[in-house]
């Protein structure tokens, strides 16, 4: 089977299905690929091809995820679907599958259920920016008033977690009927695709964001000065531009006097490239791994934040025992470990392996961070959890 050429002409958008177990997420995923392939070209994926998802590792955590792709006339979508609730929790927290928007599937026969709420909350915590609702199994509900009631409940739930519930697109459909080729319900899948195109804005590309490079190594080159190396996470750095060195110590300023890659001198380094950046007037000992180079004013160092974390189960190589308040692990951000203390939510005494939990973390050194930054929780170099900065506090 030859690999299809990756079409670079269309904007690329990452989405995924979320929602309560058995509300039809995987059936909808199959229906979208099938109906869009039939309408706009591309390849359909059967339910059972999606449901037996392969395992992947993200930050040392095993997650079952299915990836499908589909096209509308204006965009190319990469779509993730997870078989189990725990896989969603892990996926969203580790950022293994970053979503530019999510399709929340709610069965009209049940209305919102506990995992519906949990996935909306997780979406808020981990920074999923847009949610579109697919009200599924509408072929099984004859009562218009009941559908309106369920719709109202979903809108209220979204609003509770700071999503714009009143303005959220809601499509009433039947994934199964659409998959079976019923034209009336296929039209609802096309309607859903239309909302994906219009409601989720085109994501900003990494290269268009402000420059950031996590420092991996520092060298001093006699006669030339200090070079830091790392992979440019976002943006572009040009020779002659000012940069800030942020994190761990007080923020310092410098100027980039050279960029090199594979021993060749360049005039700029771009997102995704591994580069060496030569800095003016900085001594080797003034800079260290774990700091970042950044566009001045674009990122600040912080020590305290609210986070959403997933603690690995024993089977995943995590802890065998719970931990309590006063737990002091290392938090691994980008390229370095920093010790931190935790505060658990009111009424939570201990955290078991396999749990996901909200916690406030205070680090002993500041780290350059924004909301949405991912981290690992480690004990002596072994990963015991994964987390995301939900809200910077100080």
From Swiss-Prot:
SUPFAM superfamilies: EF-Tu/eEF-1alpha/eIF2-gamma C-terminal domain, P-loop containing nucleoside triphosphate hydrolases, Translation proteins
Cysteine pairs bridged by disulfides in the record: none
GO molecular function terms noted in the UniProt entry: GTP binding; GTPase activity; guanosine tetraphosphate binding; translation elongation factor activity
EC number: 3.6.5.3
Annotated segments matching region G2: 60-64
Binding site for GTP: 19-26, 81-85, 136-139
Region (G4): 136-139
Region listing for G5, in residue ranges: 174-176
GO cellular component: cytosol
Chain segments carrying region G3: 81-84
Cytoplasm as UniProt keyword: yes
Record's function text: GTP hydrolase that promotes the GTP-dependent binding of aminoacyl-tRNA to the A-site of ribosomes during protein biosynthesis.
Record text on subunit structure and interactions: Monomer.
Protein name: Elongation factor Tu
Organism listed in the record: Cronobacter sakazakii (strain ATCC BAA-894) (Enterobacter sakazakii)
